[in-house]
Swiss-Prot record:
It comes from Shigella dysenteriae serotype 1 (strain Sd197). The lineage of its organism: Bacteria, Pseudomonadati, Pseudomonadota, Gammaproteobacteria, Enterobacterales. It catalyses: glutathione(out) + ATP + H2O = glutathione(in) + ADP + phosphate + H(+). This is Glutathione import ATP-binding protein GsiA. InterPro entries: AAA+_ATPase (IPR003593), ABC_transp_ATP-bind (IPR050319), ABC_transporter-like_ATP-bd (IPR003439), ABC_transporter-like_CS (IPR017871), Oligopep_ABC_C (IPR013563), P-loop_NTPase (IPR027417). The complex is composed of two ATP-binding proteins (GsiA), two transmembrane proteins (GsiC and GsiD) and a solute-binding protein (GsiB). One of its GO terms (molecular function) is ATP binding.
């Protein structure tokens, strides 16, 4: 049945009165109510709101992916203009017809790349499959196009990455693969669900620029789901604000940022962390929290005397971590990924040291190496005077009670067969800390501390949004009252209100219990807010380390300055330069086996502030 006359000529998508519900305990729970919007050709519509507001389920409903998950979808109209210019009603399409629509006419970049990529196929096979299916290309042509798309999203050694499996890539790399796959068939509508959440600011800038370029080339409509208001200001033409499943405000990006009408929109904007807000301050400051009655009151500075003088709780010296790459007919190790190269730092009780850098710079590997989740090839890791790198498995398990890890991908770190209450209570049982009733009470307290309800303990991970799952992982890490928490992108998946709550919670726990944090993040505004010291990593080495105020207010290394320059600003009138200061050819940290890389030499430029001496081998130093 033709629908061309029902869709305005300039529109590629129109939705009227979308309602989404789920059945729980034989009750219908509404997730989205009476949502209507349209999308013009070449336009970017940003959908923003808190975690659980209905943003992602709206996208899944458009892709017709909710029915198989038990979602109840009702809609008066859900029209799509395909690449062929034919207009179809999405709700009328069969499962077979939708397989031809997805990817070709409407593509989606999902929030959690590890669960969206098939672990048993290489990256190249997965991108090429979509190209072969929708473009009738041969296998060879599809692989050539797959390599070109990886180059487009700035993945170094793209030819090598084609033959890698998803688990062999960092979180940021996996997200770039997802973006390459979604853009490979040049769809009429691209739905991007938090596409840059896992990316550092420099790659984020390139991806946003890439989406803009392809959007202009193809007159592609983009629905951009995000909680990052800086990204919204940079990429959006119109903004739709959602709150508790309803659209509370919509307008142009200038109207939303300069004249917000709804109290929630005003509170959302007021809670956005601004880079430079900590200028002149030495200690971390609590985030303002969203309140509809009192939009984002400014919190007073923390009385921050948490750093304990004396011996560091964690001492790392010349840490080296490498991964072998095999090739050839005999499958021999011929090359190595130099993930971490001679990294050294100290962490004091009550201190927050942030590790920042691009995806693939070695941040996450450094954190994992500290707990021996990956084995290192050299260096020393000393916790409270005890060598971690030489401990037996039994002693290492006991030590992990004092050092906890918050992982980057919350869905992959929760057992889908266990309720979240069981997941949180498990470390208490393993270490024999609390009897049954006390452990259950502890779980309820932890859930409340991270902004969830005690009754959520009986639910399973798939019943929560991405942001809610990350809060569950944080509650689990806090269960044992550890001395050190390694937080790997712990708040990157959270919206600004929950992010503020979690950061404030971490600061409260640091003040009350003297917890030390190794905070791994690409969100420079959050890093500025929470850190005592900052270490900048590039190609597996620390190129600048020092007090947060010194690094942010007086960055000495060119790479540090480029990281700060790439941060999006939550102000539509203050656009970044069209070309963010990045080199055209990304250097690689893959080297021939036995080849040694010269370690950088750090030079003192101020109290506790050290910077790598200029060396010609850094690509970014040559520009």
């Amino acid at each position: 049945m033709p629908h061309s006359d029902e869709l305005d000529a300039g529109n590629v998508l129109a939705v009227e009165n979308l309602n989404i519900a789920f059945m729980q305990d034989q009750q219908k729970i509404a997730a989205v109510r009476n949502l209507s919007f349209s999308l013009q050709r070449g336009e970017t519509l940003a959908i923003v709101g808190e975690s659980g507001s209905g943003k992602s389920v709206t996208a899944l409903a458009l892709m017709r992916l909710l029915e198989q998950a038990g979602g109840l979808v009702q809609c008066d109209k859900m029209l799509l203009r395909r690449r062929s210019r034919d207009v179809i009603e999405l709700s009328e399409q069969s499962a077979t017809q939708m397989r031809h629509v997805r990817g070709a006419d409407m593509a989606m970049i999902f929030q959690e790349p590890m669960t969206s990529l098939n672990p048993v196929f290489t990256v190249g096979e997965q991108i090429a499959e979509s190209i072969r299916l929708h473009q009738n290309a041969s296998r060879e042509e599809a692989m050539v196009e797959a390599k070109r798309m990886l180059d487009q999203v700035r993945i170094p050694e793209a030819q090598t990455i084609l033959s890698r499996y998803p688990h062999q890539l960092s979180g940021g790399m996996r997200q770039r693969v997802m973006i390459a796959m979604a853009l490979s068939c040049r769809p009429a509508v691209l739905i991007a669900d938090e596409p840059t959440t896992a990316l550092d600011v420099t790659i984020q800038a390139q991806i946003l620029q890439l989406i803009k370029v392809l959007q202009k080339e193809m007159s592609m409509g983009v629905i951009f789901i995000t909680h990052d208001m800086g990204v919204v200001a940079e990429i959006a033409d119109r903004v739709l604000v959602m709150y508790q499943g309803e659209a509370v405000e919509t307008g142009t990006v200038e109207q939303i940022f300069h004249a917000p009408q709804h109290p929630y929109t005003r509170a959302l904007l007021a809670a956005v962390p601004q880079l430079g807000a900590m200028k002149g301050l030495d200690y971390p400051r609590r985030f303002p929290l969203i309140s509809l009655e009192h939009p984002a009151k400014q919190a007073p500075p923390i009385e921050q005397k948490t750093v304990v003088d004396g011996e560091p709780v964690l001492r790392v010296r010349n840490l080296v971590t490498r991964f072998s790459l095999r090739s050839g007919l005999l499958n021999r190790v011929t090359r190595e990924v130099h993930a971490v190269e001679k990294v050294s730092f100290d962490l004091w009780p009550g201190e927050t040291l942030s590790l920042v850098g691009e995806s693939g710079s070695g941040k996450s590997t450094t954190g994992r190496a500290l707990l021996r989740l990956v084995e290192s090839q050299g260096g020393e890791i000393i916790f409270n005077g005890q060598r971690i790198d030489t401990l037996s498995p039994g002693k290492l398990q006991a030590l992990r009670r004092d050092i906890q890890f918050i992982f980057q991908d919350p869905y992959a770190s929760l057992d889908p067969r266990q309720t979240i209450g069981d997941s949180i209570i498990e470390p208490l049982r393993v270490h024999g800390l609390l009897p049954g009733k006390d452990a259950v009470a502890r779980v309820a307290w932890l859930l409340e501390r991270v902004g969830l309800l005690p009754e959520h303990a009986w639910r399973y991970p798939h019943e929560f949004s991405g942001g809610q799952r990350q809060r569950i992982c944080i509650a689990r890490a806090l269960a044992l009252n550890p001395k050190v928490i390694i937080a790997d992108e712990a708040v990157s998946a959270l919206d600004v209100s929950i992010r503020g709550q979690i950061i404030n919670l971490l600061l409260d726990l640091q003040r009350d219990f003297g917890i030390a944090y190794l905070f791994i993040s690409h969100d420079m505004a959050v890093v500025e807010r929470i850190s005592h010291r900052v270490a900048v990593m590039y190609l597996g080495q620390i190129v600048e380390i020092g007090p947060r105020r010194a690094v942010f207010e007086n960055p000495q290394h060119p790479y540090t300055r480029k990281l700060l320059a790439a941060v999006p600003v939550a102000e539509p009138s203050r656009q970044r330069p069209q070309r963010v200061l990045l080199s055209d050819d990304l250097p690689s940290n893959i080297h021939l086996r036995g080849e040694e890389v010269a370690a950088v030499s750090l030079q003192c430029v101020g109290p506790g502030h050290y910077v790598a001496q200029p060396q010609s081998e850094y690509a970014f130093m040559r520009r």
